[in-house]
């Protein structure tokens, strides 16, 4: 597995975001937590503050093999409202790249007509 980006939004479920990053790093996967905010700071669904590695605009998605969308109701809403996240999801689908979505996040793929049914 090459490079993985986990999208981080305010209101995301901390365990769904950070556990993915932790497990992949333990498996020696190059994984990056990318904030969709203008800053690295994230405030999770349970009021836990943590920092991303980079912001969304710092990522060259041509070099990324997989994206991960964590759940959390507010986090899902923030990811869905971010035009860049939606565009990357659509681009990954067209390029047959990996997309993982947890909990409430698959609805982002449905809203963008990536999933049907």
Residue ranges and their predicted role:
Residues 1-95, 108-117:
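Extended, subdomain-level signal for the structured scaffold at the beginning of enzyme domains
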Residues 102-103:
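Short, thiol/selenol-centered motifs that function as redox-active sites or metal-ligating centers
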């Amino acid at each position: 597995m090459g490079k993985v980006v986990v999208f981080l939004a305010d209101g995301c479920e901390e365990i769904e975001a950070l556990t993915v990053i932790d497990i992949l790093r333990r498996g020696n996967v190059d994984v990056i937590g990318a904030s969709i905010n203008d800053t690295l700071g994230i405030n999770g669904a349970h009021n836990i503050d943590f920092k991303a590695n980079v912001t969304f605009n710092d990522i060259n998605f041509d070099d990324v093999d997989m994206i991960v969308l964590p759940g959390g109701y507010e986090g899902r809403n923030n990811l869905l409202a971010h035009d860049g996240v939606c565009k990357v999801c659509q681009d990954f689908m067209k390029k047959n790249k990996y997309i993982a979505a947890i909990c409430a996040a698959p609805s982002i793929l449905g809203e963008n007509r990536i999933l049907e049914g």
